[in-house]
């Protein structure tokens, strides 16, 4: 059974309205940040506290813009890679119930490439304002702003190694995604079990690779924003937030498609299974909050 989504002018118009509304709200938010003296003082105190009270940093309105932009880039890229992880889990577990809905998480995974490019661009623009450890004076013992804690992490937290990890993780993740897409299309075209066996192998390797690299990515992209603080549970926390968000998005899109006449073969049992997924990992996320 073949279904083709009709991306008609009405849908495009509604998306345009949402985009315009988001842009207006962003402008209003920036205006409030720029012109709110009370908020300025509060954030200045927070930044001062973060800088160990030595006045290392001075708050500017664009710091809040940069930090929110970075976290959103990380969040939506995390949803994208988690959707791919969902597909891999289905092949590794040899699940049959989800075979009719895998096109949805595969489509969400398409954000991985543009999201990766956007992440590199945003990091290039915002790294000194978001990541305190990128300032060279923190490693100079003759400078009064020297930070022995951050200097002790220099072997790991340095720009070449950080960027190398970022490019490596994003590149290998996309490679796995491209391989999964290739063999899914091949399976649809040729049938049989050869492509399925390859998908099983690729997905197994990807799940193992992702289990390690996702935690390291969480340390790099989120935890290192506050270099003095650490948590042994942080990788799990970020995984849970990405994973449950991806599950919720997958479920939401499937419901919307069914309500508009698509995915008619998806029955209530499938929706019930997705609901159990979302509920279970919402509880898990709450537990490690």
Q: Could you describe each region identified by the protein language model?
A:
Residues 1-79, 150-157:
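N-terminal regions that are enriched for targeting/export leaders
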Residues 3-20, 67, 71, 99-117, ...:
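Alpha-helical transmembrane segments and their helix-start/interface "positive-inside/aromatic belt" motifs
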Residues 15-16, 26, 43, 153-289:
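Long, contiguous internal "core" modules enriched in hydrophobic/ aromatic residues
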Residues 20-27, 109-129, 280-289:
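Hydrophobic alpha-helical membrane-insertion segments
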Residues 33-45, 73-189, 203-206:
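Transmembrane-helix bundle segments that line or gate the permeation/cavity pathway
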Residues 59-60, 86-88, 262-269:
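Short, charged/polar, low-complexity loop and linker segments
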